[in-house]
Amino acid sequence: MQGSVTEFLKPRLVDIEQISTTHAKVTLEPLERGFGHTLGNALRRILLSSMPGCAVTEVEIEGVLHEYSTKEGVQEDILEILLNLKGLAVRVAEGKDEVFITLNKSGSGPVVAGDITHDGDVEIVNPEHVICHLTSDNAAIAMRIKVERGRGYVPASARIHTEEDERPIGRLLVDATFSPVDKIAYSVEAARVEQRTDLDKLVIDMETNGTLEPEEAIRRAATILAEQLDAFVDLRDVRVPEEKEEKPEFDPILLRPVDDLELTVRSANCLKAEAIHYIGDLVQRTEVELLKTPNLGKKSLTEIKDVLASRGLSLGMRLENWPPASIAED
């Protein structure tokens, strides 16, 4: 029975064709004309770029200082090994944002993901994945691998500048592909409901790396899309109040003790004798007032002026509401 001309059809049939544990086709129909591409493109973009997952982000290989090198007894160069590590499919227990796993292998033959040692919080989904090949019985390789939780794709170059100071020599960064979705495509076919033949049928064909089932991936992508669209349901001007940073009443340097100025013992003792304990106390004094201080001569005065000037301060400054409550309570 036909509904109102202004009423939108909602999909009534969802068919899931499970081709393998990592490959599935999901069919959604009927959709109003044009909605197949609207929803298909939105879901495709989210599945490719916004799905959370786990990936290798760093690796330390024994005897290797940088990625542009080779290791004796290993067929692949280091860059190729890093590329192979990107293909490692890892599932990490919820609540863990990063874990470390290790690999120690010796003897001729392939080194695979199944050779990796890990605890119960980690699962290697593709244990047959080849990492490298050892070329002799005396060859060996040892590495420590960092796996992190993230979203989308984060190239190593994006983390070089932020981690350069803390990263020791020999710790190699890896381009991180966090998304568990390997391939995603959609097509729109014709659908029919009673006498209407201008409707859409959306078919989503996708493959994952095994850490997430295709059906669950689509469900999560749809949830992300729905949450983002919620903001458009009610377009009243509801603004999230910006948190205003409270500016300190006084420059922090004024709250520091005069000992931080590292004056000579003579000058420091003279100031303490006059109950000048903080830099804020000092800058409010004039040259004339300081020269009246017992045992503080012109040499000490010059020293004080120079030290204050080096910090952008001077004598004779006026500070409203000094001292602050935190100092007054002391």
Swiss-Prot record:
InterPro entries: DNA-dir_RNA_pol_insert (IPR011262), DNA-dir_RNA_pol_RpoA/D/Rpb3 (IPR011263), DNA-dir_RpoA (IPR011773), RBP11-like (IPR036603), RNAP_asu_C (IPR011260), RNApol_insert_sf (IPR036643). Coiled coil: none annotated. Residues 250-330 are annotated as: Alpha C-terminal domain (alpha-CTD). Pfam families: RNA_pol_A_bac (PF01000), RNA_pol_A_CTD (PF03118), RNA_pol_L (PF01193). Belongs to the RNA polymerase alpha chain family. Homodimer. The RNAP catalytic core consists of 2 alpha, 1 beta, 1 beta' and 1 omega subunit. When a sigma factor is associated with the core the holoenzyme is formed, which can initiate transcription. The N-terminal domain is essential for RNAP assembly and basal transcription, whereas the C-terminal domain is involved in interaction with transcriptional regulators and with upstream promoter elements. This is DNA-directed RNA polymerase subunit alpha.
